[in-house]
Amino acid sequence: MQIVQETIALSTLEQMAAGMFGTLVKAVVDIEQGIMAVGGEMHADEEALLLDEGSPQPSLWGINLYPAQFGTPRFIEFDSMINIRPRQGNRTRSVDDAAVRAAVTSIVERLVSR
């Protein structure tokens, strides 16, 4: 697992996907700090890593990245158990708030480079 604060190469994500799940890389994005953790077996592992580094839990959102779909809407999948947060109004594994989805998308687009 690693925390991405600057950029990560798409080729690195492709290697992670091949070594773990085949087509996807799990990631957790901190929308407050504009960083993400990648490469964990579970979103909860990445969430714990970011929490240990001082990220506030309410700003952490789990996604899946599909490197082969880079540049398309299918690159980011909003699906994680850590996203179920009734107190924040998010009752699904997805991210229901459009502003949060936009923030996650913007951060991922900034951090992942071809």
Predicted regions: what is each one?
Residues 9-17, 86-97:
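Short histidine-centered catalytic/ligand-binding loop motif
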Residues 41-75:
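Amphipathic, interaction-prone secondary-structure segments
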Residues 93-114:
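Well-ordered alpha/beta subsegment
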